[in-house]
């Protein structure tokens, strides 16, 4: 839109709103309004004819192309499986030569149909689609003229309202007289333009309707006979379709059922057609007697591995944690008949204790009394008097290694996806690494973990210990 057109549209805006809401004096011409409605009907009819003709030609061409593609698909299905057989002696010819021949024959018939109907499609485009397109161009030009007439009506009503308002003003100043003269001039000019376009359209639109009617009616009639000719060609070609593979004398459903035989039953009898894959389900405690058994098999291997790891502590754990000071850590196990079970495990696996026992004789180190202090405090606080007296007579053994830092948090890896089923549950996906907050030795129970800042409980048999 040009600047001039924009300013005109802006000046017409108040009058446009008054016209829409029927406020003030609005010019109405019943004869023109009736002609305008007939013109809109003509425009709709012409568009529909052009669209229907175009859709029809596209549908016929698409139908034939689809039939060719269908024949190609049947040929590919009937062909034997390509590739070299692993055992040439057991190779069987699985192709359907008769079916391939029938599909090829049907394909040739469709190709012949395309050639015969190509001329009919060209006739439809030449006599229906193209003339209708020319009519639509004329209709668009006339529509622009109708729009211009409506704009002239808005200008006419606008200038008339302004002129009438200034004319009814009683005490007019020199400035008002000047405005009145300008408004009268604009009103006369807009009145002449409106009358010109309004009278021209009222006179020429009926002539256009008569010409369009004499133009569109033969198009509809010709389009009908063109479709009839297309259907006749299709019927003649397909009725003389002589393909021995098909039995045209019997019902199509009966022929299909006879050819299919018991293929469906044999296919459904195959085991591979009933194979289903699904992840193990887990029932929360207290939901039924079968909840525990349903997931025990999926986690048995992980439970056995975890129990073996618990029965054999690693050397790194034993060396990092020093033995309690209240136990005879530097004496041999053979001189004491009743050492504690925990001391025996630490003594056999701790390299620091064995080195100290080899350096200092057993007779020089009497067993110290059992002290109630914890192991970490016994290393750094003064010892009891008997121990101090014994230590004064012999060289002081090297200090025990400092207590190791707190063990790292335990983590598990998710084996399956789990969605929270109740408030307090922790959702995760397969492969997520979850920090364990609290757990039991039974993987069929619910553990507590933390993932991405969220803490909650989850089934133990859905995860694997790292």
From Swiss-Prot:
Keywords from the named record: Coiled coil, Phosphoprotein, SH3 domain
Positions of region (Disordered): 280-342
Boundaries of every SH3 domain copy: 407-466
Biased composition (Low complexity): 294-303
Coiled-coil residue windows: 31-67, 177-204
Keyword check for Coiled coil: yes
Gene Ontology BP, a term: plasma membrane tubulation
Domain (BAR) ranges: 17-269
InterPro entries in the cross-refs: AH/BAR_dom_sf, BAR_dom, BIN3/RVS161-like, SH3-like_dom_sf, SH3_domain
Phosphoserine modification, residue list: 298-299, 301, 303
GO cellular component terms attached to this protein's record: actin cortical patch; actin cytoskeleton; mating projection tip; medial cortex; mitotic actomyosin contractile ring; Rvs161p-Rvs167p complex
UniProt-recorded Gene Ontology molecular function terms: protein-membrane adaptor activity
Top-rank taxon, per record: Eukaryota
Pfam families reported in the protein's UniProt record: BAR, SH3_1
Function summary: Has a role in DNA damage signaling as a part of stress response processes.
Protein's name in the database: Protein hob1
Native source organism of the sequence: Schizosaccharomyces pombe (strain 972 / ATCC 24843)
């Amino acid at each position: 839109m040009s600047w001039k057109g924009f300013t005109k549209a802006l000046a017409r805006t108040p009058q446009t709103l008054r016209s829409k809401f029927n406020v003030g004096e609005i010019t109405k011409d019943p004869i023109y309004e009736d002609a305008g409605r007939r013109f809109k009907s003509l425009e709709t009819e012409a568009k529909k004819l052009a669209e229907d003709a175009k859709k029809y030609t596209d549908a016929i061409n698409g139908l034939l192309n689809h039939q060719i593609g269908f024949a190609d698909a049947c040929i590919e299905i009937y062909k034997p499986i390509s590739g070299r057989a692993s055992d040439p002696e057991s190779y069987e010819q699985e192709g359907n030569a008769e079916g391939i021949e029938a599909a090829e024959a049907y394909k040739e018939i469709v190709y012949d149909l395309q050639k015969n109907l190509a001329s009919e499609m060209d006739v439809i485009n030449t006599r229906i689609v193209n003339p209708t397109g020319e009519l639509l161009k004329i209709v668009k030009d006339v529509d622009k003229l109708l729009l211009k007439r409506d704009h002239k009506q808005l200008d006419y009503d606008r200038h008339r309202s302004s002129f009438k308002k200034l004319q009814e003003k009683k005490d007019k100043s020199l400035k008002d007289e000047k405005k009145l003269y300008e408004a009268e001039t604009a009103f006369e000019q807009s009145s002449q333009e409106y009358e010109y376009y309004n009278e021209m359209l009222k006179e020429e639109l009926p002539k256009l309707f008569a010409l369009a009617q004499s133009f569109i009616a033969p198009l509809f009639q010709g389009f009908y006979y063109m479709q009839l000719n297309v259907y006749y060609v299709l019927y003649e070609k397909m009725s003389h379709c002589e393909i021995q593979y098909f039995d045209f004398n019997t019902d199509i459903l009966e022929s299909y059922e006879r050819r299919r035989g018991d293929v469906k039953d044999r296919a459904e009898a195959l085991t591979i057609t009933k194979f289903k894959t699904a992840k193990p389900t887990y029932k929360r405690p207290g939901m039924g007697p079968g909840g525990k058994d349903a997931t025990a098999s999926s986690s048995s291997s992980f439970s056995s591995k975890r129990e073996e790891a618990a029965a054999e502590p690693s050397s790194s754990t034993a060396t990092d944690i020093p033995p309690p000071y209240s136990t005879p850590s530097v004496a041999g196990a053979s001189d004491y008949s009743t050492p504690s079970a925990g001391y025996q495990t630490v003594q056999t696996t701790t390299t620091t204790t064995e080195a100290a026992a080899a350096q200092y004789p057993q007779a020089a180190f009497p067993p110290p009394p059992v002290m109630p202090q914890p192991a970490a405090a016994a290393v750094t606080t003064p010892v009891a008097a008997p121990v101090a007296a014994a230590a004064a007579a012999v060289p002081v053994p090297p200090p025990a290694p400092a207590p190791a830092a707190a063990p790292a948090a335990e983590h598990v890896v998710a084996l399956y996806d789990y969605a929270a089923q109740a408030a307090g549950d922790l959702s995760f996906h397969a492969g997520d690494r979850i920090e364990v907050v609290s757990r039991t030795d039974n993987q069929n129970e619910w553990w507590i973990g933390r993932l991405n800042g969220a803490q909650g409980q989850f089934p133990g048999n859905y995860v694997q210990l790292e």
